Amino acid sequence: MKKQLLVTAIGLAIVLGACSNKANNAGTVGESTTVATENTTVDNTDTTETSIALSKAKIHLKYSNLADNETRGRVKKALANAGLSEDKINKFFEAVDEYNNAVGSKNLVQEMTSIEAAFPTFDQDKLIDAWLNNNQGFVGRNCRITSYSLMGDFIKVGNKTPGDTTMLFNDFAAIDAKKIFEGEDKEKFDTIFSYIDVNNTHDTNELADEIVKSWNDKQISFDNDKMHMISVFMTMDDGKNAVQEFIGHTGVLVNDKDKYLFIEKLAFELPYQVDEFDNLQDVNDYLMGYYDNDAEGLTAKPIIFEDNHVMKEYRVLK
C-alpha cells in the first residue's frame, strides 16, 4: 500500500487514466488503456456475454519479461514478419532494456515461464523501488505508449479531434519527457486514446456501438492483418460528470507461427510482459479474468476490442 501511494504521488490518475498497477495482497499485477478503428466501418458490435463462461480458476499463463534472448528473438522475428520497421523494433527493445536494466534481471522471470495461475505475481514493492531509484525522474512507459509505439505506423486517423484527454496527463508527461511522439504521431495518439462520453448503461452492446461510432467519426482505421491492437474498454463513472468509456489496458497481438504473442507493458513502473496463447479465446479470457473485477456490478462489464471491433471471442468469465 505504501508504494501505491508513492506511485500516486508521481501521477495521481494512474488508476483512472493510465496503464496502472492494481495489486491484490498476493502481488498480482494489472493495468489500464484506449484503442481505435479499422479500414471498414463496423456496424455489428454484438457483445454477447456468453453463458458458456470459463471459471477464472481454470486460466493458466505462459509469459516472459523479455529478459531472455530466446523470447526476444521470437518477438523480434514476429514483429518483423508483421511488417514493423527495424527502427521501431530496435526502439521497442531499447525501452524494454531501459526498464529491465533499472529494476534488475533478478526481479524478472528469466525465460518463457508457465505458471499454474491466471496471472503472474511480482515483488511489487521491490520493482517499484528499483524503478524509482534508477529512472532518473522519468515516469516510464505504460500500455498505451507501448502499443502505439508498435502499432502507430499501421493506424490512420483522418479526423484528428481528440475528446477528453484530462486523465492522460501521466502519458503526456512521459511522452514530453523523452519526445516519444511528436507532431502527427502525438495528434494521433491523443485522438485514439481520448475518453468517450457514453450513455449511462450496463448494456455492453450499446456501449460498443458508441465506441465504434466515436472512432468512425474520428476516421480511425487499422491496416495490418498480422498484428492487432487489443484493448480493454472500461467505464468511468464518478457520479458527477458524463459516463465515459476508456481503454484501461491495451497490448499488441502478433502471430508467431501457430501461436499468438501478446505484448504488453503492465504499468509505468511495472514490467514488460509477453504472453503466449494458443488461440484468441485464451487472449480474451486472460484479459477478462483480470480486468472484470467489479463483483458488485456497479459499472458495465469490460469490453475487449480487436482493432476497431469487439473480439469475436469476447465472453464474460464466471
Segments (PLM) and residue ranges:
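Positively charged n-region of N-terminal signal peptides that target proteins for export
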Residues: 1-4
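Sec-dependent N-terminal signal peptides
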Residues: 7-13
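C-terminal motif of bacterial Sec signal peptides marking the signal peptidase cleavage site
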Residues: 15-18
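Cysteine-nucleophile amide-bond enzymes
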Residues: 20-318
